[in-house]
């Protein structure tokens, strides 16, 4: 394309979940437009009526908004189905120019002629002069010789001999355009200058480049095919096998900043040794020419670690605001009127340093707002053995008489544990399980200080009595 205004498009299909791979492609497109002062177009390719659902389109818009690509900052959404007449008109033009022809070959007939139904089309109907009719699709007449060279910012200049490109279908028997043609018509008429998409589309590119030329374009767009994303087994991410829905990460409590930063690393890297970098730095340095063509490994553990770092970078006030959706029903297991904002604020800083995703806040603080400790049977069995019963009895008694602060609580439990031959780490376990229901969580003594003397002693008494009852 020439040196005019840069225009990119993100063109998802509303046929299911919004994939993390789609999110990465959207971000790459967004940054190219942003850096060039150009335009980002959201085009929803909804021509497959049997699979499209309106809620999937809404999900795309919502996901982009979460990533910072907000309505009002881009053109669209443009529904591809609204342009069906333009696609049909292009198909007619190609046929009238002798660049396309009707074909009534079935898969069975092709298999009979070639011995393999999967074999590329053999051109049987090229010169039969068929007119439109039932069961007759329209095929593009590819050149017999020459080479189609694709200039790709990431993959160089792959070449495709034209005699290996079959005469491909561009319109169905009912006149509706297939993806290959509709995609090109829309890109051409919308003035798209850069097509940035996943490498799985690379095999379509020579066909689409031929269509660009056939429809009168002086030159094709700038192509950039970003690397495939793979799982830990180096298999392409699959929605049937892998956790790929952006919504599931959002609902689990991943921050958009962390997700954006991590997705950008799937094929690209900022300069220097730091991978966690301000978004402003990514905006100012991202360049498609720096994207590597090799497969990019989606490491959920690394993403989780990234998210933890982003959480810890928040102020306590920002953290409290971020976890708010998880602090009330239905996300929270406690009654709405049981939650106390002051109590939570007192432990928020302790929790912030320990969670990797926001949803982890619930099991970390639920003991503060539930009427009884949410005791896990495995935790109970692990902690409530040996001298636990007598220790809890002593703790219940002594905790009624001491100053109620974390330092005193720690010193007191250390002393009581020593009487029973237990180091502090071992002495803490039955007390923690009695009060919180779990073997791990917030710092124990700071938690007890916030929870309060009477509430703590009630939980310890309940555990003591349960042990006594056998």
UniProtKB/Swiss-Prot annotation:
Motif ('HIGH' region): 12-22
Residues holding ATP: 239
Pfam families membership: Anticodon_2 (PF19269), tRNA-synt_1c (PF00749)
Residue numbers binding Zn(2+): 103, 105, 125, 127
Catalysed reactions listed for this entry: tRNA(Glu) + L-glutamate + ATP = L-glutamyl-tRNA(Glu) + AMP + diphosphate
Localisation: Cytoplasm
Any one Gene Ontology molecular-function term assigned to this protein's record: zinc ion binding
Top-level EC class: ligase
Cellular component GO terms, alphabetical: cytosol
SUPFAM superfamilies named in the record: An anticodon-binding domain of class I aminoacyl-tRNA synthetases, Nucleotidylyl transferase
Cofactor comment text: Binds 1 zinc ion per subunit.
Cofactor dependency: Zn(2+)
Its EC number(s): 6.1.1.17
Motif ('KMSKS' region): 236-240
UniProt xrefs under CDD domains: GluRS_core (cd00808)
Keywords: Aminoacyl-tRNA synthetase, ATP-binding, Cytoplasm, Ligase, Metal-binding, Nucleotide-binding, Protein biosynthesis, Zinc
InterPro entries documented for this protein: aa-tRNA-synth_I_cd-bd (IPR045462), aa-tRNA-synth_I_codon-bd_sub2 (IPR020751), aa-tRNA-synth_I_CS (IPR001412), aa_tRNA-synth_I_cd-bd_sf (IPR008925), Glu-tRNA-ligase_bac/mito (IPR004527), Glu/Gln-tRNA-synth (IPR000924), Glu/Gln-tRNA-synth_Ib_cat-dom (IPR020058), GluQ/Sye (IPR049940)
Single GO biological process annotation from the record: glutamyl-tRNA aminoacylation
Function: Catalyzes the attachment of glutamate to tRNA(Glu) in a two-step reaction: glutamate is first activated by ATP to form Glu-AMP and then transferred to the acceptor end of tRNA(Glu).
Subunit structure: Monomer.
The family this protein is said to belong to: Belongs to the class-I aminoacyl-tRNA synthetase family. Glutamate--tRNA ligase type 1 subfamily.
Protein name as annotated: Glutamate--tRNA ligase
Gene: gltX
């Amino acid at each position: 394309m020439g040196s005019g205004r840069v225009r990119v498009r993100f063109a998802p299909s509303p046929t299911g979940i919004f994939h993390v791979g789609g999110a990465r492609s959207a971000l790459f497109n967004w940054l190219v437009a942003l850096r060039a002062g150009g335009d980002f177009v959201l085009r929803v390719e909804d021509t497959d009526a049997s699979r499209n659902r309106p809620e999937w389109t809404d999900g795309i818009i919502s996901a982009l908004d979460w990533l910072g690509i907000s309505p009002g900052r881009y053109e669209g959404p443009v529904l591809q189905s609204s342009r069906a007449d333009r696609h049909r008109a292009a198909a007619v033009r190609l046929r009238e120019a002798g660049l396309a022809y009707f074909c009534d070959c079935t898969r069975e007939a092709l298999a009979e002629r070639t011995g393999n139904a999967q074999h590329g089309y053999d051109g049987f109907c090229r010169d039969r002069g068929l007119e439109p009719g039932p069961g007759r699709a329209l095929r593009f007449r590819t050149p017999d010789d020459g080479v189609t060279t694709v200039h790709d910012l990431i993959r160089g200049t792959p070449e495709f001999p034209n005699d290996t490109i079959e005469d491909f279908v561009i319109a169905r028997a009912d006149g509706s355009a297939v993806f290959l043609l509709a995609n090109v018509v829309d890109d051409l008429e919308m003035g798209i200058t850069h097509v940035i998409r996943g490498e799985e589309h690379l095999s379509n590119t020579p066909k689409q480049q031929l269509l660009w030329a056939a429809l009168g374009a002086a030159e094709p767009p700038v192509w950039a095919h970003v690397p495939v994303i793979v799982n830990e087994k180096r298999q392409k991410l699959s929605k049937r096998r892998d956790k790929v829905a952006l919504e599931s990460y959002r609902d689990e409590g991943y921050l958009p900043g962390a997700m954006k930063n991590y997705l950008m690393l799937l094929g690209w890297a900022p300069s220097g040794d730091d991978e966690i970098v301000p978004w402003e730095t990514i905006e100012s340095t991202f360049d498609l020419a720096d994207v590597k063509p090799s497969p990019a490994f989606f490491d959920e553990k690394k993403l989780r670690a990234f998210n933890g770092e982003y959480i810890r970078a928040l102020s306590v006030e920002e953290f409290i605001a971020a976890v708010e959706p998880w602090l009330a029903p239905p996300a929270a297991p406690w009654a709405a009127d049981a939650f106390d904002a002051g109590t939570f604020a007192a432990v928020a800083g302790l929790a912030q340093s320990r969670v990797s995703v926001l949803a982890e806040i619930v099991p970390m603080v639920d003991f503060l707002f539930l009427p009884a400790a949410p005791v896990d049977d495995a935790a109970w069995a692990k902690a409530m053995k040996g001298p636990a019963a007598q220790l809890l009895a002593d703790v219940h008694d002594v905790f009624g008489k001491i100053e109620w602060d974390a330092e005193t609580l720690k010193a007191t439990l250390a002393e009581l544990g020593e009487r029973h031959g237990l180091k502090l780490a071992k002495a803490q376990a039955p007390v923690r399980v009695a009060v919180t229901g779990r073997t791990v969580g917030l710092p124990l003594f700071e938690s007890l200080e916030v929870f309060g003397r009477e509430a703590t002693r009630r939980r310890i008494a309940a555990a003591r009595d349960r042990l006594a009852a056998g």
